[in-house]
């Protein structure tokens, strides 16, 4: 399959990849059908892509999905689109190891790389940075864009240092081009009200000083992709679709777009808001993902109808999956300035803000649950600042971490009835329980 595409990478985080990738999508979308992708497990950056290109951005994560899973997703979501823009994660060679890096994603998908290099407080040294990144593993670097250029003289110094790849242009320094961050990364597009203005401003800067035609030319040089099997097997299709009730509001909005699409094969999707005290009749599945419940504790404590509904459905045996922020909501209480009472399906007390826990997980399934069977090994990702600080004697765990921290003493996957709650986030291309049984 022919699918023109590029990866936007850098030497480090905080280089401007997200806003430049998103603004480039916006510029290209004026004359092409653009699909955004995000290397790695991030939930926030794809929101910027989605706003920019006006289609959902798709995660490509070698740890969570495996090589074949990544290829399937790239092909599945590239069909019908003129170009794909894949934003890398951290620096080019970073990850749990280089085999799970943006570089490796470029290799397995045969995708050319365009570097974004933050040139603040540096000029000619940029040449050494680019050469080092290219030569370290003979990376498919085909171009470079300079970010935070202070003047034409600054640009010329940087440009003259580059010998081996094309300089595609620059983004001038402007403090209004930045997006603020908080404890889990950039502000989400829902919470940062200036997102659209920033996108428009950076898009204009790209149009003025970046060679868009060259970028398209590089994307067109990407090798063809070999077709692979469908994302879901016939055995996993269910013609009698039940309802999957998915929590979605400012407190709970960390979901992989592909997870929701995969659930559509088996369920009719309906969304509800705990913040608005909503519920959905007769669900076959309730899914409460991550997000920022710690910013909405008062409203969540008052969501009495949603709380009663979730407890009733749990006691009936309805499948319930709660990840990270969802785990917090299903706990006994969240402690911040005071104790806020939650659903209390699990006798767990959660401290709202502690040290940042971030990284991949690998878990042995100790007992059957809605995501896996005993003896299986699941991979996930944890990303939170909260912490379990008290645990009742009756809390049971269905998973044990080989890698990662989990909820308590390297155990994760708290289980009661047919409900599973974890600090790990999962990708359903590999954790297929909700699709298979």
UniProtKB/Swiss-Prot annotation:
Site label Increases nucleophilicity of active site Cys, positions: 425
Reaction(s) this enzyme catalyzes, per UniProt: cob(II)yrinate + 2 L-glutamine + 2 ATP + 2 H2O = cob(II)yrinate a,c diamide + 2 L-glutamate + 2 ADP + 2 phosphate + 2 H(+)
Positions of the GATase cobBQ-type domain: 243-433
GO biological process: cobalamin biosynthetic process
Active site (record annotation): 324 (nucleophile)
Alphabetized UniProt keyword annotations: ATP-binding, Cobalamin biosynthesis, Glutamine amidotransferase, Ligase, Magnesium, Nucleotide-binding
Protein's UniProt name: Cobyrinate a,c-diamide synthase
Organism name: Sulfurisphaera tokodaii (strain DSM 16993 / JCM 10545 / NBRC 100140 / 7) (Sulfolobus tokodaii)
């Amino acid at each position: 399959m022919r699918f023109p595409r590029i990866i936007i990478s850098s030497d480090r985080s905080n280089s401007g990849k997200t806003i430049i990738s998103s603004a480039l999508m916006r510029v290209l979308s004026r004359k092409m059908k653009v699909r955004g992708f995000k290397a790695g497990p991030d939930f926030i950056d794809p929101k910027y892509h989605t706003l920019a290109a006006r289609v959902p951005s798709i995660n490509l994560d070698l740890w969570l999905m495996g090589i074949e899973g990544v290829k399937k997703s790239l092909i599945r979501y590239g069909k019908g689109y003129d170009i794909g823009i894949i934003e890398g994660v951290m620096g080019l060679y970073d990850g749990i190891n280089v085999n799970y890096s943006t570089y490796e994603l470029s290799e397995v998908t045969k995708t050319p790389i365009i570097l974004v290099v933050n040139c603040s407080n540096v000029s000619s040294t940029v040449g050494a940075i680019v050469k080092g990144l290219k030569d370290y593993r003979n990376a498919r670097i085909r171009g470079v864009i300079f970010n935070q250029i202070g003047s034409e003289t600054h640009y010329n110094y940087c440009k003259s240092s580059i010998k081996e790849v094309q300089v595609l242009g620059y983004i001038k320094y402007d403090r209004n081009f930045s997006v603020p961050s908080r404890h889990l990364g950039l502000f989400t597009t829902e919470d940062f009200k200036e997102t659209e203005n920033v996108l428009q401003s950076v898009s204009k800067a790209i149009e003025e000083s970046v060679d868009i035609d060259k970028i398209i030319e590089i994307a067109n040089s990407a090798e063809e992709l070999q077709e692979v099997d469908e994302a879901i097997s016939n055995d996993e299709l269910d013609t009698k679709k039940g309802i999957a009730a998915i929590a979605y509001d400012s407190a709970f909005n960390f979901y992989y777009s592909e997870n929701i699409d995969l659930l559509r094969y088996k369920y009719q999707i309906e969304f509800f808001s705990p913040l608005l005290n909503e519920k959905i009749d007769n669900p076959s599945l309730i899914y409460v993902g991550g997000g920022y419940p710690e910013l909405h504790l008062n409203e969540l404590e008052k969501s009495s109808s949603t709380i009663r509904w979730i407890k009733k459905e749990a006691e009936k045996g309805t499948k319930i999956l709660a990840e990270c922020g969802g785990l917090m909501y299903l706990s006994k209480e969240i402690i911040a300035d005071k104790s806020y009472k939650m659903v209390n399906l699990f006798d767990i007390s959660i401290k709202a803000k502690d040290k940042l826990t971030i990284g991949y997980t690998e878990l042995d399934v100790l007992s059957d649950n809605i995501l896996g069977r005993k003896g299986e090994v699941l991979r996930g990702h944890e990303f939170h600042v909260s912490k379990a600080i008290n645990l009742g004697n009756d809390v049971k765990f269905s998973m044990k971490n080989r890698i990662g921290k989990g909820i308590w003493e390297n155990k994760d996957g708290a289980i009661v009835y047919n409900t599973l709650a974890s600090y790990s986030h999962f990708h359903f291309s590999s954790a297929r329980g909700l699709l298979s049984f």
